[in-house]
Design a protein with these regions (language model features):
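Conserved helicase RecA-like core
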Residues: 1-326
Length: 326
């Protein structure tokens, strides 16, 4: 959406750089990524943009707003905070994009989202984008959008990601060991591991580091600056394993991830789709392995396989420690 927004705003520039386009996103990492896209695509335009999010001091963000911005990328909490302080003005907003709409609601931002929507004077250019659209998102669309058109992009077989999906029975305390064995056998260099809890990310990362594997993790309790440093190391290829929770990983855009490990089965089917979609990009073959540690996890992965229509092949380690079909 960045390119058409830049094109439209550049065709009718305003000298005072008033806020005309707002992009709302659930996480700091994704906000930064979107801001980088506007920076790259709008390099030779006279439009200004700013990125605001919580977890850091607001003074630099306020200074950018006071200088005037045409485009604002924001997370809900910091946006409402600065709006309530009088630093963000939505009266002349022309374009509003709600990115990762489903995740926004899952994270409990529904109240902030509706407050923002209520303050927008015109909803003729209101767009919602998400890899998966929940019923709650559609409810918002029907209430706030005028004569909305629903556009679904279908994957054709030629461009469908080639991701081999596997499932493996692994005890709770054996997940990091399983990752190490798979890495030793496959030689994969760039890997992502997803956990459902912050504690799990810490434990698995510590184990991998003890085994001499370059691994680091991010989650919601890690300071923003540290999270950005870890993500940049992964982008540069300096980490072999990047461990994260679902929310913290939003905004990571790396095309050559060899394998995705689901250390815990995600609670939502859409999270499974988001996770494995990190691999198999740019016409490369990807691999996703999900660890099953108890009966509820088995039931969840069975439901995911059925609902997403994916074949998830059972695998195990044989007596020699090699991977084989179960």
């Amino acid at each position: 959406f960045a390119s058409p927004i830049l094109q439209r705003l550049s065709e009718a520039r305003t000298p005072d750089h008033r806020l005309r386009a707002l992009i709302l996103t659930p996480t700091r990492e994704l906000a930064i990524q979107i801001g980088e896209s506007f920076e790259a695509y709008g390099k030779y335009l006279s439009l200004r943009h700013a990125v605001i999010f919580g977890g850091v001091g607001q003074n630099p963000q306020v200074e950018a707003l006071n200088r005037g911005v045409d485009i604002l990328v924001a997370t809900p909490g910091r946006l409402m905070d600065l709006h309530d302080q009088g630093f963000v003005h939505l009266e002349q907003l022309e374009i509003f994009v709600l990115d990762e709409a489903d995740r926004m609601l899952d994270m409990g931002f529904i109240h902030d989202v509706t407050r923002i929507l209520d303050k927008i004077p015109s909803r003729e250019n209101l767009g919602m984008f998400s890899a998966t659209i929940s019923r709650e998102v559609m409810d918002i669309a029907w209430v706030y959008q005028r004569d909305a058109a629903e556009i679904t992009v279908r994957e054709d077989e030629q461009n469908k990601p080639d991701i081999k999906q596997f499932r493996m029975d692994v005890p709770h305390d054996g997940k990091a060991d399983a990752i190490e064995k798979i890495l030793n056998e496959t030689g994969f260099d760039r890997c992502m591991a997803f956990c459902n809890t912050k504690g799990s990310t810490e434990r698995i990362t510590k184990f991998l580091q003890m085994r001499g594997i370059d691994a680091e993790c991010i989650h919601g309790d890690i300071p923003q600056r540290k999270r950005e440093q870890v993500m940049e190391k992964f982008r540069r290829g300096e980490l072999r394993v990047f461990v994260s929770t679902d929310v913290a990983a939003r905004g990571i855009d790396v095309d050559d991830v060899d394998i995705v490990f689901n250390c815990d089965v995600p609670d939502e089917n859409q999270d499974y789709v988001h996770r494995i979609g990190r691999t198999g990009r740019a016409r490369r073959q990807g691999v996703a392995v999900t660890f099953i540690s108890d009966y509820p996890a088995k039931m969840r992965i069975d439901d995911i396989a059925q609902k997403t229509r994916n074949e998830i092949v059972p695998v195990k380690f044989d007596e020699d420690g090699r991977l084989t079909t179960a």
